């Protein structure tokens, strides 16, 4: 029972924070440190790692569900021109994930091993929080030149993808890095968020299957309870992420990202204090 409660709580946190620019990793670390829920033999180190990636995949399914029509090049509802535009969008997404493939996958394990500590996570939470506030203040006098995702060029997609690589540093936030990058490069908030969602699809599928493959190659297997726990976390993350995406896209129609910047600074400060007190490692 406690295992399912933990899966539900972490699934909720993942769903809420994966696409908001606030760092899902930082929030999950905090939650796991504070919950102290008895977890029996289910939450082994290997299973916990795979679980974290499986719930990220659940959040990705929310993107696919919400944007299925827009991302489906085979839709009978689309004209030939619209299908062509959809294929072009997918090519730009692929171009955008190339930096993550080249740098991210190569450095991800190194970063987790050497930078996954409260000093780094709290610092990146605070630094990017300040960055959001500074950049949004600058944007007040700048009119975005890219107001539709189809206006993103291949070159621009690659540059945004380079910003995504920054998220391999724990606490950065993948969506936060790509949204900031896209805004700096001239995209509107709406386009920046939308393209960030699309970039997450191949990245998270790739990372999840790599982690799963590594788990099984090392002789790992799931017990019946672990399978149930993973499925529950996956579904909860999917459902909550659906609402989180809807909320954010409605919110940024009339608001900027500064509130997320202030929030990151507060959470970063809390994370730092908890780290100094030994509550998180």
Curated annotation (Swiss-Prot):
Keywords: Antibiotic resistance, Cell membrane, Cell shape, Cell wall biogenesis/degradation, Hydrolase, Membrane, Peptidoglycan synthesis, Transmembrane, Transmembrane helix. The gene is uppP. It comes from the Bacteria. This is Undecaprenyl-diphosphatase. GO terms for molecular function: undecaprenyl-diphosphatase activity. It catalyses: di-trans,octa-cis-undecaprenyl diphosphate + H2O = di-trans,octa-cis-undecaprenyl phosphate + phosphate + H(+). NCBIfam families: PRK00281.1-5. The chain crosses the membrane at residues 2-22, 46-66, 93-113, 115-135, 152-172, 190-210, 228-248, 259-279. One of its GO terms (cellular component) is plasma membrane. Pfam families: BacA.
